[in-house]
Amino acid sequence: HLEFADNWRYLKAHPLEVTGDILLLAGDIGYLGDDNYSKHPFWDWASENYKEVHCCMGNHEFYKYYDVATLPDGYLLEVRPNVFSHYNGIARIGDTDIILSTLWSRIPLEDAYFTEQVISDFRRILYKGELMTHAQFNAEHERCLTFIKDAVAYSQAAHKIVVTHHVPSFRMLHPKFQGSKANVAFTVELEDYITDSGIDYWIYGHSHTNIDARIGNTQCLSNQLGYVFSNEHQDFSHGKYLTI
């Protein structure tokens, strides 16, 4: 969330610990089409300190009225020569496929009116020139999920990592959100798929809470800074890493 000055001030004062060659970011870095995104000094720092940086796009990437319908599968934005933001993309590094997707979630019809009223996505994101609706939100989820499943199924890599913005199981729902009708805009239940997927790691964001869980043989991980001005950064790890 580099669109907020408090977050950048915090990261400048407490930079990431470089504990690996590749930096993976699960979305909500800033607004696409905004100079503050493309010219942000964080990208220069990340480019200099990591061999490669790969991000999936979060919902906030589209908050300057970006038209999601214009994004094809495999869309790749080169932020710096070794820094990339993906919409339904695959990065092959050595014997590992990194599959990156926003994912979105699935909003049941009975929750659609409430969700459209309380979630900013439906006031800030376009789809085919109009404000996105819950039906289009759900359609993007189906597109993303199909992409992920196909990418995993056809992968010949020894290891597979999935990076999504939205949360892939209610196993990672923080107790403070239990019972909220808005949960359907943040999380989708994919436990049955994940259990037998053969995915090594699934990295997620969006929830501003960090809960790791093992589903089958897949380790689900998160390390979100959240909003510093809301004091959501207390359990953020500056050097969290995984080894393949």
Segments and roles (model prediction):
Residues 52-127:
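A basic- and aromatic-enriched beta-loop-alpha substructure that forms the phosphate/nucleotide-
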Residues 99-161, 166-177:
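Active-site-proximal loop/helix segment associated with metal-binding centers of metalloenzymes
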Residues 1-55, 61-70, 127:
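N-terminal active-site segment of His-dependent metallophosphoesterases
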Residues 1-7, 31-35, 60-67, 90-92, ...:
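Active-site environment of divalent metal-dependent phosphoester hydrolases
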Residues 23-28, 54-59, 84-88, 161-164, ...:
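Active-site neighborhood of phospho(di)ester-bond hydrolases with catalytic His/Asp-centered motifs
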Residues 91-94, 174, 181-200, 208-244:
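Binuclear metal-dependent phosphoesterase catalytic core
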Residues 49-52, 157, 199-200, 217-218:
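A short helix->loop->beta-strand "cap" motif at the edges of active sites that frequently abuts
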Residues 11-15, 43-47, 82-95, 99, ...:
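Short amphipathic alpha-helices and their capping/turn segments at secondary-structure boundaries
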